[in-house]
């Protein structure tokens, strides 16, 4: 299949899906705001990124990925880099953040082009990948509770409190069996209305309040960062080292596996194409101060949870970002700072639970449990058949243990790399135990054969 024919098929599928369920696609496009908004706003306020460039280039990335892959792949912040820039002021300079993003992108791009990512994917067991997804999902739930919902009062302020969070959560539960209900779209519209009300009713100087409202601030791509990105300083390199395992495992390997689980009827993007996509997104946008971004399993789960089933959803999101970035740019910061945490937190929880749910297929339906054989098909004609491998109780227990060990490492140390190492060590320990047991049984059979009498 040529590139043009592939793109034509993808666009036909995108259009057909959008026509079939337009509200679901629009709602799904907004499903990942819980991950995007808090980090993007925090980085923009402290000057670590340019909000206008971030909206423009992340919007372009959304449009391109939706048109090329045809599934709702998210464009998310690089969380480890963002966390370091926010928590440590000396790491928050824009040139440092951009250099860190470029280091990660260069590394992922090199791994993709050399085939190293494919080798890693073949040799990472499914229970470890599932553990990374489960850990990422539970991390989102915990982050929603600790950073968005915990400090809210029950009744104050009137438009952002725990009662609103409880109400949003109950509506989420009641509508979970109504796939066409545009939950994220409704929450987004309500949140924007609350943000406008919060700004309008805020006490202070009228001129300051007017500055907090969006106004025409047309983006001009003149803030070129040139070559002064401090590439070889310790700070960007250390930030990149912390981000690389997260990007490789969660934004490339795990998101490819999750796409196969959630959208089995759609062509699954390869880890190589995911890596190239991450590399190119940042090697372009970071020169203009755009936030370092990647794909992510959590974002895909969130957009799927709220209705997205094709690339049409993120193409619409990309167009919205592009328009906002070009027309309003940095004037949006004041409004976005008042986005209600109560409603945002519930969306993050829903996204985390959707991602964590993929762990249920570990012992039934996982990709490594399907076996292919040549033989008679059901209609009597010869062909290739697929059947599900039956696991013993010991195998089920072993796979659960490896997955939970991976998840435990992620949650305990808040680090995907440590969780990955813990899961792999657990997996290899089981393999070593199996080989040791076989060797010992072989020794016992040889010994018993040597000591048996010749005549009976």
Model feature map: region roles:
Residues 1-20, 24, 122, 379-381, ...:
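Intrinsically disordered, low-complexity regions flanking or connecting the multi-pass transmembrane cores
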Residues 90-202, 316, 320-456:
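Membrane-embedded alpha-helical modules
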Residues 27-30, 124-128, 158, 238-248, ...:
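Hydrophobic alpha-helical transmembrane segments of multi-pass membrane proteins
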Residues 27-89:
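Transmembrane helix-boundary motif of multi-pass solute transporters/channels
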């Amino acid at each position: 299949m040529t590139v043009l024919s592939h793109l034509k098929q993808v666009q036909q599928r995108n259009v057909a899906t959008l026509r079939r369920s337009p509200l679901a696609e629009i709602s799904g496009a907004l499903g990942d705001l819980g991950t995007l908004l808090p980090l993007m706003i925090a980085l923009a306020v402290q000057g670590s990124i340019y909000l206008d460039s971030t909206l423009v280039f992340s919007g372009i990335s959304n449009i391109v990925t939706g048109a090329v892959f045809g599934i709702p792949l998210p464009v998310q912040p690089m969380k480890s880099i963002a966390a370091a820039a926010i928590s440590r002021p000396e790491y928050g300079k824009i040139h440092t953040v951009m250099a860190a993003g470029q280091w990660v992108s260069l590394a992922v791009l090199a791994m993709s082009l050399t085939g190293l990512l494919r080798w890693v994917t073949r040799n990472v067991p499914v229970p470890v990948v599932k553990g990374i997804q489960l850990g990422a999902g539970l991390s989102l739930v915990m982050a929603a509770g600790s950073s968005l919902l915990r400090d809210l009062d029950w009744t104050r302020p009137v438009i952002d409190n725990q009662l609103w969070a409880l109400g949003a959560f109950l509506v989420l539960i009641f509508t979970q069996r109504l796939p066409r209900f545009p939950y994220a779209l409704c929450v987004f519209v309500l949140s924007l209305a609350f943000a406008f009300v919060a700004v309008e009713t805020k006490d202070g100087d009228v001129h300051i309040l007017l500055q907090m409202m969006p106004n025409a601030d047309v983006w001009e791509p003149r803030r070129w960062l040139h070559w002064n990105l401090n590439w070889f300083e310790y700070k960007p390199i250390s930030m990149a080292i912390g981000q690389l395992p997260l990007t490789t495992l969660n934004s490339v390997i795990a998101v490819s596996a999750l796409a196969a689980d959630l959208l089995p009827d759609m062509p699954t993007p390869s880890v190589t194409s995911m890596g190239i996509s991450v590399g190119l997104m940042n090697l372009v946008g970071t020169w203009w101060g755009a936030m370092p971004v990647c794909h992510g399993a959590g974002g895909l789960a969130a957009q799927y949870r709220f209705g997205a089933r094709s690339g049409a959803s993120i193409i619409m999101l990309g167009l919205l970002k592009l328009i906002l970035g070009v027309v309003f740019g940095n004037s949006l910061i004041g409004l976005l700072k008042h986005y209600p945490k109560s409603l945002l937190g519930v969306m993050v929880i829903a996204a985390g639970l959707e991602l964590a749910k993929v762990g249920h297929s570990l012992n039934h339906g996982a990709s490594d449990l399907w076996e292919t054989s040549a033989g008679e098909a059901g209609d009597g004609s010869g062909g290739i058949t697929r059947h599900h491998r039956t696991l013993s109780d010991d195998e089920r227990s072993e796979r659960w243990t490896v997955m939970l060990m991976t998840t435990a490492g992620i949650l305990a140390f808040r680090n995907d790399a440590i969780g990955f190492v813990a899961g792999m060590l657990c997996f290899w320990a089981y393999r070593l135990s199996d080989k040791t047991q076989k060797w010992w049984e072989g020794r016992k059979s040889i010994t018993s054969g040597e000591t048996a009498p010749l005549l009976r």
